[in-house]
Amino acid sequence: MTDRWLVTGAAGMLGRDLVALLRGLNEPVVAITRHDLDITDRLSVRAVVDRHRPTTIVNCAAWTRFGEAEAGESAALLVNGGGARELAAVCRDRSIRLVHLSTDYVFDGTSRRPYAESAVTSPINAYGRTKQAGEQAVLDLLPDDGTIVRTAWLYGRHGMNFIRKMVRLEQLRETVDVVDDQWGQPTWTVDLAQQIVALVRHGASGVFHGTSAGEATWYDLARMTFRLLGADPGRVRPVPSDRIAGGELRPRYTVLGHDAWREAGLTPIRHWTTALTQAFPLLNADES
């Protein structure tokens, strides 16, 4: 049976690439933006689902504004926790597969090795707590048909991100200060979109980490961006997190392990440097 996809958050960086990929594969897909649907509204969620009758929903919708989540956690929780619960509930009632996007920030960052998919979550900030609530709702309501894909440090063509910010700052400043004590995995939205499609086609469920292989600091990522621009990476200066507003609330080490992909018979996402080298001409063209 052909999958019928419904993608929420379809105007976002990942959502746009996922919808474009599915259309390129001639897969039936409905792109839903926040203007089309409030995922916290139960009646609206069920009406949209019943109108389009998808077999798979990918929830890319989220409250991602980190600082605003700290200032108003209840509003972020309504979307990241409550919205996920509403989608999971309708998927349970209609026998629909749900892929829910989550974050590395569900972890506290105290580990010194990549977090396994089964590692205990312990967020240290409001954003992480609200995303943890969404994960739990999906796993509680859809133990067999729910899939959590945690991702991190996303970049892509559609919307502002760290790479595009560095491209602009290289043109505006002689030097750029970048945090060098937070570790993660830069991940191209195109790679993640391909991984989500492979996951659904394979019929796998559970928790997966949708991040690139390898690890880096923001400082490492900024230096590589400068190198790809043909600029001097020495213009990037390392600074500690406590020099950045809100830095104390961000976990230091949230590198994610990828064993679940291999156990499901799937290949994890490639190394972040390989992906960025391929993606960069596309990103830079948009800034020219």
From Swiss-Prot:
GO terms for biological process: dTDP-rhamnose biosynthetic process; novobiocin biosynthetic process. NADPH binds at M13, L14, D38, I39, A62, W63, T64, Y127, K131. Its cofactor is Mg(2+). Its EC number is 1.1.1.-. It comes from the Bacteria. GO terms for molecular function: dTDP-4-dehydrorhamnose reductase activity; magnesium ion binding; oxidoreductase activity, acting on the CH-OH group of donors, NAD or NADP as acceptor. NADH binds at G12, M13, L14, D38, I39, A62, W63, T64, Y127, K131. Reduces the product formed from the reaction of NovW with dTDP-4-keto-6-deoxy-D-glucose to result in dTDP-5-methyl-L-rhamnose in the novobiocin biosynthesis pathway, an aminocoumarin family antibiotic that targets bacterial DNA gyrases. Belongs to the dTDP-4-dehydrorhamnose reductase family. PANTHER family: DTDP-4-DEHYDRORHAMNOSE REDUCTASE (PTHR10491), METHIONINE ADENOSYLTRANSFERASE 2 SUBUNIT BETA (PTHR10491:SF4). This is dTDP-4-keto-6-deoxy-D-glucose reductase.
